């Protein structure tokens, strides 16, 4: 039995969240009656309203009246009035991942997991399958520029989804094809230990059916170790590693783009194949690796070399992934979601490859607990930045932790040899600081998962106003 067509209304608590909004949009496009609520107005809320979805701002018990099912994410607290009302009225309450799993049961599915790179890789797989006329349904964790949204309903038999590991619910997703980009210590508030994180990713791959396959990056030592532990499943490895089944070769930066080739090795048939002259309109080794994962899936599903080559060259990117928001006096302003040390290092390396002048990083640390648990890593991930501007920690609902704040982070960076580290007193002061240190050709990269994206879009205009 699958999700009945006549069920509804389906009420989403926190419908404006990036994961929730995508599922709500696809359900709406499938013909289900969808409604929801969110704590505040947002671009996602506005977009869903344009599709005819009724959305209330603020959480109230009466919002769930008449609903047949209530969908919640892990961000919703147990004392949320809508959740309490749903349970009091015996309305079924399901987690976001459970509803996503119901949608996935309607299609053959590619699920993309990993500590970093999920959103970009999901977008790349979607772009390649689009080009191959698969017309996939897509549910992503970021806004795909080609769609102007993070979700779309396709008429084809395939679905491409981002698998969020943060709360462990990605293990509920019935994927036929799984991608694992990397595995790093993250979300330890849920998993408690890094060993538990690794075990979850192992289970994710082993959930793939015998007729499916997993694509795993063996440039990452933890993923390489996982490959050796997984039995009875078909694994396709990728990376620059000479042992990879799908190998990234001859990677060269080309301004804000990358060129490379990919070599395939079929161990069973003992054959080799190569796709040369690949161009990706994004900088950075990490993005080339993400593209290699997408190419591995596309090749396995039968796309031609020319289709892969053209689709990759035309890839439009993802919002908040090395997104240029504007420029001033020859200075490029970049917005990026990077908020983990591994992500920050990769983004700054890409910026370094894109300019011959300075890279100026502006970082808004995200969550006190993350800064505390990875403090040493944060102090050593800015090596490709000539200057680091540090904002206050974005709490994301957390209480402050003594000694874990902007000023101690500044001291930590200086203690690790950074010569120019500037504490930002308030967001309104950012334009003045950048104006005083940036020169033509420089890249100013704003990093974080909080509201720093708003600063990134405002900064070009503020700089122009200063002259």
Swiss-Prot record:
Tell me one GO molecular function of this protein: UDP-N-acetylmuramate-L-alanine ligase activity
Q: What is its main location?
A: cytoplasm
* Localization of this protein: Cytoplasm
Q: What is its EC number?
A: 6.3.2.8
One GO biological-process annotation of the entry reads:
peptidoglycan biosynthetic process
Q: State the top-level EC class.
A: ligase
The role this protein plays is: Cell wall formation.
Alphabetized PANTHER family for the sequence: UDP-N-ACETYLMURAMATE--L-ALANINE LIGASE, UDP-N-ACETYLMURAMATE--L-ALANINE LIGASE-RELATED
Protein name, entry field: UDP-N-acetylmuramate--L-alanine ligase
What species is given as this protein's source?
Rhodopseudomonas palustris (strain BisA53)
Q: Which lineage?
A: Bacteria, Pseudomonadati, Pseudomonadota, Alphaproteobacteria, Hyphomicrobiales
């Amino acid at each position: 039995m699958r999700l009945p067509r006549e069920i509804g209304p389906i009420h989403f608590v926190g419908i404006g969240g990036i994961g929730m909004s995508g599922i709500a949009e696809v359900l709406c496009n499938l013909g289900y009656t969808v409604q929801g609520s969110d704590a505040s107005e947002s671009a996602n809320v506005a977009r869903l309203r344009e599709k005819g979805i009724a959305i209330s701002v603020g959480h109230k018990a009466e919002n769930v009246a008449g609903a047949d099912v209530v969908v919640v994410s892990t961000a919703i607290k147990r004392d949320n009035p809508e959740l309490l009302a749903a349970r009091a009225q015996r309305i079924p309450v399901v987690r976001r991942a459970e509803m996503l799993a119901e949608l996935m049961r309607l299609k053959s599915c590619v699920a993309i997991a990993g500590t970093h790179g999920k959103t970009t890789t999901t977008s790349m797989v979607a772009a390649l399958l689009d080009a191959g006329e698969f017309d996939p349904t897509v549910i992503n964790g970021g806004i795909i520029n080609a769609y102007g949204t993070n979700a779309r309903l396709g008429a084809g038999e395939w679905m491409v989804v981002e698998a969020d590991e943060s709360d462990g619910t990605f293990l509920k997703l019935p994927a036929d094809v799984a991608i694992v980009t990397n595995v790093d210590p993250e979300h330890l508030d849920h998993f408690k230990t890094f060993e538990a994180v690794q075990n979850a990713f192992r289970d994710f791959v082993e959930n793939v059916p015998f007729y499916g396959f997993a694509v795993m990056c063996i440039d990452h030592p933890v993923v390489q170790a996982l490959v050796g532990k997984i039995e009875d499943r078909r694994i396709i490895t990728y990376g620059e590693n000479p042992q990879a089944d799908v190998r990234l070769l001859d990677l060269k930066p080309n301004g804000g783009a990358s060129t490379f080739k990919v070599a395939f090795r079929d161990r069973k048939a003992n054959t080799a194949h190569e796709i040369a002259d690949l161009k990706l309109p994004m900088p950075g080794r990490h993005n080339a690796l993400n593209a290699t994962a997408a190419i591995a899936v596309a090749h396995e599903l039968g796309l031609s070399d020319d289709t892969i080559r053209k689709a990759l060259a035309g890839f439009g990117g993802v919002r908040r992934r090395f997104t240029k928001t504007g420029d001033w006096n020859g200075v490029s302003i970049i917005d990026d979601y990077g908020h983990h040390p591994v992500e920050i290092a990769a983004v700054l390396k890409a910026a370094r490859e894109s300019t011959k002048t300075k890279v100026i990083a502006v970082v808004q640390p995200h969550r006190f607990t993350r800064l505390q648990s990875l403090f040493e890593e944060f102090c050593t991930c800015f090596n490709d930045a000539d200057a680091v501007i540090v904002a206050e920690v974005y709490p994301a609902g957390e209480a402050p932790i003594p000694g874990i704040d902007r000023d101690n982070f500044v001291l930590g960076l200086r203690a690790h040899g950074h010569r120019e580290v500037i504490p930002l007193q308030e967001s309104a002061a950012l334009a003045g600081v950048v104006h005083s240190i940036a020169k033509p050709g420089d890249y100013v990269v704003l990093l974080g998962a909080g509201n720093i994206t708003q600063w990134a879009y405002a900064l070009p205009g503020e700089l122009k106003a200063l002259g």
